[in-house]
From Swiss-Prot:
Gene giving rise to this polypeptide: hemL
Cofactors required: pyridoxal 5'-phosphate
UniProt KW Transcription keyword: no
Family membership noted in the UniProt record: Belongs to the class-III pyridoxal-phosphate-dependent aminotransferase family. HemL subfamily.
Keyword Cell division found: no
Substrates-to-products reaction catalysed: (S)-4-amino-5-oxopentanoate = 5-aminolevulinate
Any single biological process term in GO: protoporphyrinogen IX biosynthetic process
Native species: Methanothermobacter thermautotrophicus (strain ATCC 29096 / DSM 1053 / JCM 10044 / NBRC 100330 / Delta H) (Methanobacterium thermoautotrophicum)
Keywords: Cytoplasm, Isomerase, Porphyrin biosynthesis, Pyridoxal phosphate
Modified residues (N6-(pyridoxal phosphate)lysine): K259
Recorded GO MF terms: glutamate-1-semialdehyde 2,1-aminomutase activity; pyridoxal phosphate binding; transaminase activity
Protein name in the entry: Glutamate-1-semialdehyde 2,1-aminomutase
Amino acid sequence: MKSEELFRRASNVLPGGVSSPVRRFDPHPFFAAGGSGCLLESVDGESYIDYCLAYGPLILGHAHPRVVEAVNEQIKRGTTYGVPTEGEIELAEAIIERVPCAEMVRFTNSGTEATMAAVRLARAFTGRDRIVKFEGSYHGAHDYVLVRPGSGAATAPDSPGIPVDTVRNTLTVPFNHEEAMAELIEGAGEDIACILVEPVMGNIGCIEPENGYLQFLRDITRENDIILIFDEVITGFRLAPGGAQEYYRVEPDLVTLGKIVGGGFPMGALAGRREIMENISPAGNVYQAGTFNGNPVSVTAGRETLRLLDGRMYSDLERKGSTLRAGLRDLLSDLDLEYQVTGPASMFQLYFTGEEVRNYGDAKKSDTVLFMEYFHGLLERGVFIPPSQFECCFISAAHESEHIEATLEAAEEVLSGLKN
């Protein structure tokens, strides 16, 4: 197999043979040759119905002709300039038009950079140092947010190379647990600059907020002059034109964006209330910069993607997601398996646990060995999902009914085999 040969070569020059940890799975990942619509082709000549979709950016599917055409036209004019472009203005205006909290936008190169800037900005605006995140949430690969679950001084780095002092100001609480958050705010609220939350936890599988939970966060942050930041790197432009804040009708102070906003190219963005955003340099003194901020190729891909995402497309995505989740639940019921199917709109995951999944602690009870058997079983049948129990699956506008039917047939075969 060519993928096996490529993986051997890759392992000599790339740590672990990949450029990002989650792409690695045993015995080796397949290597991509190309993609079209909802199908991903491997160098081995295999074709897969793709529910990974590059971990979320490809809401239109692979190689949408309009996006490809727009990008090619931009590349002919240049790939980067180092001066502003009209495209940046147009994409920022499109974001502001769609996203409820967005009054100004700063482009970055990734979601990680966007959350870094958001935390710095919140600290500067409030004059406070501490931040709150949720157990199991992921906000990029920077030091302040790579922490193990813990309380106060028990918080510890989640990676070697991060000084303990760096994360002493990062507090963690369980998701969907109002009492834990209320206790934390009561004890440390005057020192907390921001609460950073994925409205749907998409990096521990796919966990929705319980009814009223996001509004609870909005209320308690307002009462305590704490900045509420929605990390919508995953949910932005996926659940609705305005993302999770439109979908759940709760408006934060700041929002971080990534993935879909770049239309398949590297891109991030920080947006929010004008009075906060005006503190970013050069308008203010909170420093944020980047050689490729507002890169014209990424901006072009993002702008064209947002143009294509209309109301009908979101209705179709919602319908497809509902159909697939209902189909999986029916399969589990027929097979007398008590696993959990979760997710809103075009997001989903199957947890191999019999208990309801409300937060990180619940998700960690899943049988990850069984999940990987499920993953490989689907892969053998031409269906590709992320190779981790703790990632989220995505549906694109390019998935059709026949793809969902084929996926459910494959899932039935695999789950039946696992039961037996």
